[in-house]
Amino acid sequence: MRTSYLLLFTLCLLLSEIASGGNFLTGLGHRSDHYNCVSSGGQCLYSACPIFTKIQGTCYGGKAKCCK
């Protein structure tokens, strides 16, 4: 009996997260900007991009540049 209450409580918490905006599930399926930069052949640098490379985006939440 105690197990069924625990299961019901867990289910209610999960459904309340989904209904309230889904902060719990928002990050699923989203790639970080660092991952997108490196997988497209770039590199994340805090300093200026080297010669013959261009800024293609940002890394680490806009704190660094993606140079490619």
From Swiss-Prot:
<comment type="function">
    <text>Has bactericidal activity. May act as a ligand for C-C chemokine receptor CCR6. Positively regulates the sperm motility and bactericidal activity in a CCR6-dependent manner. Binds to CCR6 and triggers Ca2+ mobilization in the sperm which is important for its motility.</text>
</comment>
<dbReference type="GO" id="GO:0097225">
    <property type="term" value="C:sperm midpiece"/>
</dbReference>
<dbReference type="InterPro" id="IPR001855">
    <property type="entry name" value="Defensin_beta-like"/>
</dbReference>
<dbReference type="GO" id="GO:0019731">
    <property type="term" value="P:antibacterial humoral response"/>
</dbReference>
<dbReference type="GO" id="GO:0005615">
    <property type="term" value="C:extracellular space"/>
</dbReference>
<comment type="subunit">
    <text>Monomer. Homodimer.</text>
</comment>
<feature type="propeptide">
    <location>
        <begin position="22"/>
        <end position="32"/>
    </location>
</feature>
<protein>
    <recommendedName>
        <fullName>Beta-defensin 1</fullName>
    </recommendedName>
</protein>
<keyword id="KW-0472">Membrane</keyword>
<dbReference type="GO" id="GO:0042802">
    <property type="term" value="F:identical protein binding"/>
</dbReference>
<keyword id="KW-0044">Antibiotic</keyword>
<dbReference type="GO" id="GO:0060474">
    <property type="term" value="P:positive regulation of flagellated sperm motility involved in capacitation"/>
</dbReference>
<feature type="disulfide bond">
    <location>
        <begin position="44"/>
        <end position="59"/>
    </location>
</feature>
<keyword id="KW-0964">Secreted</keyword>
<dbReference type="GO" id="GO:0016020">
    <property type="term" value="C:membrane"/>
</dbReference>
<keyword id="KW-0732">Signal</keyword>
<dbReference type="GO" id="GO:0002227">
    <property type="term" value="P:innate immune response in mucosa"/>
</dbReference>
<dbReference type="GO" id="GO:0031731">
    <property type="term" value="F:CCR6 chemokine receptor binding"/>
</dbReference>
<feature type="disulfide bond">
    <location>
        <begin position="37"/>
        <end position="66"/>
    </location>
</feature>
<feature type="signal peptide">
    <location>
        <begin position="1"/>
        <end position="21"/>
    </location>
</feature>
<keyword id="KW-0211">Defensin</keyword>
<dbReference type="GO" id="GO:0050830">
    <property type="term" value="P:defense response to Gram-positive bacterium"/>
</dbReference>
<keyword id="KW-0929">Antimicrobial</keyword>
<dbReference type="GO" id="GO:1990742">
    <property type="term" value="C:microvesicle"/>
</dbReference>
<keyword id="KW-1015">Disulfide bond</keyword>
<comment type="similarity">
    <text>Belongs to the beta-defensin family.</text>
</comment>
<feature type="disulfide bond">
    <location>
        <begin position="49"/>
        <end position="67"/>
    </location>
</feature>
<dbReference type="Pfam" id="PF00711">
    <property type="entry name" value="Defensin_beta"/>
</dbReference>
<dbReference type="GO" id="GO:0050829">
    <property type="term" value="P:defense response to Gram-negative bacterium"/>
</dbReference>
<dbReference type="GO" id="GO:0019722">
    <property type="term" value="P:calcium-mediated signaling"/>
</dbReference>
<dbReference type="GO" id="GO:0061844">
    <property type="term" value="P:antimicrobial humoral immune response mediated by antimicrobial peptide"/>
</dbReference>
